[in-house]
Swiss-Prot record:
Upper lineage: Bacteria, Bacillati, Bacillota, Bacilli, Bacillales
Protein name, as recorded: FMN-dependent NADH:quinone oxidoreductase
Function: Quinone reductase that provides resistance to thiol-specific stress caused by electrophilic quinones. Also exhibits azoreductase activity. Catalyzes the reductive cleavage of the azo bond in aromatic azo compounds to the corresponding amines.
Gene from which this protein is expressed: azoR
Cofactor: how bound: Binds 1 FMN per subunit.
Organism: Staphylococcus aureus (strain MSSA476)
Binding residue positions for FMN: 17-19, 99-102, 143-146
Amino acid sequence: MAKVLYITAHPFNELVSNSMAAGKAFIETYQQQHPDDEVKHIDLFETYIPVIDKDVLTGWGKMSNGETLTDDEQMKVSRLSDILEEFLSADKYVFVTPMWNLSFPPVVKAYIDAISIAGKTFKYSAEGPQGLLTDKKVLHIQSRGGYYTEGPAADFEMGDRYLRTIMTFLGVPSYETIIIEGHNAEPHKTEEIKATSINNAEKLATIF
């Protein structure tokens, strides 16, 4: 039995968001095809994720030295630890994001910072950093109003590129994407684009 974290980063649901519609189709099909697997939904817009700030950095330093943390430091450090442990407990990750300003919502970066921890998801060695998530799988579903997979705007895309890079850095060997794009550039194709993405999501769910 595998554990899947379904990690969404959109303020709207599948009735409004193309990425959330594809994500919903993927998860529903996945659960039908893998009834024994556990799926946990993490809505990043409804989840408290401490940013790495002065309290967190000071708290980590105090922990290393065996010193007592303040209440705020303890609360933030403990919450980050819980997020990390939940991430480590899973076998597969499905990220659902929109493209915002060429990347993704800031809550995604906060979550990535929470799970990118030396000694846990990667380690330093004489040969350089080494990823420790060598038995995990990732799917990224992202919706973009324009066209960024290829063409003149391709070099501007920083969301999927960053997520793929950080997951490779963490050692993840399998990274899949479902990219939904062009519905703002060609509004007359909106329903066709959405239907294609849902179909692609359902197909991938059977083998993911």
